[in-house]
From Swiss-Prot:
Pfam families: C2-set (PF05790), CD4-extracel (PF09191), ig (PF00047), Tcell_CD4_C (PF12104). GO terms for cellular component: cell surface; plasma membrane. Residues 1-25 form the signal peptide. The modification Phosphoserine is found at residues 434, 441. Integral membrane glycoprotein that plays an essential role in the immune response and serves multiple functions in responses against both external and internal offenses. In T-cells, functions primarily as a coreceptor for MHC class II molecule:peptide complex. The antigens presented by class II peptides are derived from extracellular proteins while class I peptides are derived from cytosolic proteins. Interacts simultaneously with the T-cell receptor (TCR) and the MHC class II presented by antigen presenting cells (APCs). The lineage of its organism: Eukaryota, Metazoa, Chordata, Craniata, Vertebrata. This is T-cell surface glycoprotein CD4. The keyword Zinc does not apply. Residues 420-459 are cytoplasmic. The Ig-like V-type domain mediates the interaction with MHCII. Palmitoylation and association with LCK contribute to the enrichment of CD4 in lipid rafts. Phosphorylated by PKC; phosphorylation plays an important role for CD4 internalization. GO terms for biological process: adaptive immune response; cell adhesion; T cell differentiation; T cell selection.
């Protein structure tokens, strides 16, 4: 009876013995496209072991040959032959890994490691991230990131931005309008049912202006500089600054230029506009003097192969005028609605307005101060001196009359003095002539030469 049972068991085990090798099971390895992955293969035999790595279709990838001291690997006819190797220093430890470099999506599949009469299956799953339309985009453009790879295991997916914020979950991540803060490394975190995890990343570069807009506050006569720094330097582009003066119905082109190899070439400048442009980066424009007719806003547009970039720029100025009995402080150029305009006499209460103009009727004499402020910060300041209000209406007429009267008196006094001096001189001369004639008639004149000469001079 025991022999019969033994014989039946032998018949059951015999087919297994006829198999070419025993299968250890399947190991799953996950990798990232472009990276390096190591497929494991372990054996209890540590020396003089012969191993071979094959595809599922039995095409040889790599194996060893020779004794333990002089063993070397041989590559087969696999498409991976130029991207695979093994770690020879680990063979004596019973480890025969297959190292695959520069992973590709089509490397996913089943790999078989045969050591002696045993074999091990390794399932390689390759994943990658793709960016549409590109990894280098302009500020304001849209971006879609997609996870590609085998659907085996259905991992849970989580996306994180360069700011380490969780954006979305799922195989895709969409950003309809990119910000400059979105420039950097985006990561995709995969969690599998076997508790293993995989992290993939992709670098996104967002090109643009670090500042969305720029406002310059200047007093009349000061130099104005518009600066347009960029977060890139290696792009060729063309640009134009369109400017709309405050109160104008349309904008006009102030300057057009091109940038190539980090050098700026000016194409055209508005006639009679004294403006200078930098010859390199960062882009900048300079007005020698701020004039009221320049106050307004503009749009700098840059045209690149990938699209267009825009930046708003403004020039804000203050204008203080006095017409008859009215003192006016006015803002020229665009301002934030939260800004305040104030007009005050020194040490007096200010008249404040959120509009672009503030006026004072019959202003008192003194120094008036016009301020444009945002919160506690003073952005612009202008001063005006006002004379006494009592003279404000009649001052020009009275001044002209006073000046005319004074001039008349001076002329009259001068004429009188001249006439008096002239008469006195003539009377004195007549008296002298009379005296000389009398002396001559009486023959009492001196005959000395010097006296004769004096007499002749008098005559």
């Amino acid at each position: 009876m025991n022999r019969r049972i033994y014989f039946q068991c032998l018949l059951l085990v015999l087919p297994l013995a006829l198999l070419p090798a025993a299968t250890w099971g399947k190991t799953v390895v996950r990798g990232k496209a472009g990276a390096i992955v190591e497929l494991p293969c372990q054996s209890s035999q540590k020396r003089n072991s012969v191993f071979n790595w094959k595809h599922a279709n039995q095409v040889k990838i790599l194996g060893n040959q020779g004794s333990s001291s002089s063993s070397f690997w041989l590559k087969g006819n696999s498409p991976l032959s130029n991207r695979v190797e093994s770690k020879k220093n680990m063979w004596d430890q019973g480890s025969f890994p297959l190292v695959i470099k520069d992973l590709r999506m089509d490397d996913s599949g089943t790999y078989i490691c045969e050591v002696g009469d045993k074999k091990m299956e390794v399932e390689l799953l390759v994943f990658r991230l793709t960016a549409n339309p590109n990894t280098r985009l302009l500020h304001g453009q849209s971006l879609t990131l997609t996870l590609e790879g085998p659907s085996v295991g259905s991992p849970s997916v989580q996306w994180k931005s360069p700011e380490n914020k969780i954006i979305e979950t799922g195989p895709t991540c969409s950003m309809p309008k990119l910000r400059l803060q979105d420039s950097g490394t985006w990561s995709c975190h995969l969690s599998f049912q076997d508790q293993n995890k995989l992290e993939l990343d992709i670098k996104i570069i967002v090109l643009g202006f670090p500042k969305a807009s720029a406002t310059v506050y200047k007093k009349e006569g000061e130099q104005v500089e518009f600066s347009f720094p960029l977060n890139f330097e290696d792009e060729s582009l063309s640009g134009e600054l369109m400017w709309q003066v405050d109160g104008a119905s349309s904008a006009q082109s102030w300057v057009s230029f091109s940038l190539e190899d980090r050098k700026v070439s000016v194409q055209k400048i508005l006639p009679d506009l004294k403006i200078q442009m930098s010859k390199g980066l960062p882009l900048s424009l300079t007005l020698p003097q701020a004039l009221h007719r320049y106050a307004g806003s503009g749009n700098l547009s840059l045209t690149l192969d990938k699209g267009k970039l825009h930046q708003q720029v403004s020039l804000v100025m203050l204008k203080v005028t006095q017409v008859k009995n009215k003192l006016t402080c006015e803002v020229l150029g665009p301002i934030d609605p939260k800004m305040k305009l104030s007009l005050k006499l020194e040490d007096q209460e200010a008249k404040v307005s959120t509009q672009k103009m503030v006026q004072v009727l019959d202003p008192k004499a003194g120094t008036w101060q016009c301020l444009l402020s945002s919160g506690d910060q003073v952005l612009l300041e202008s001063k005006a001196d006002v004379l006494a209000t009592g003279l404000s209406h009649q001052q020009p007429t009275l001044l002209a009359g006073a000046l005319g009267g004074t001039a008349g008196l001076v002329l009259f006094a001068g004429l009188c003095i001249y006439c008096c001096v002239k008469c006195r001189h003539r009377r004195h001369q007549a008296q002298r002539m009379s005296q000389i004639k009398k002396l001559l008639s009486e023959k009492k004149t001196c005959q000395c030469p010097h006296r004769l000469q004096k007499t002749y001079n008098l005559l």
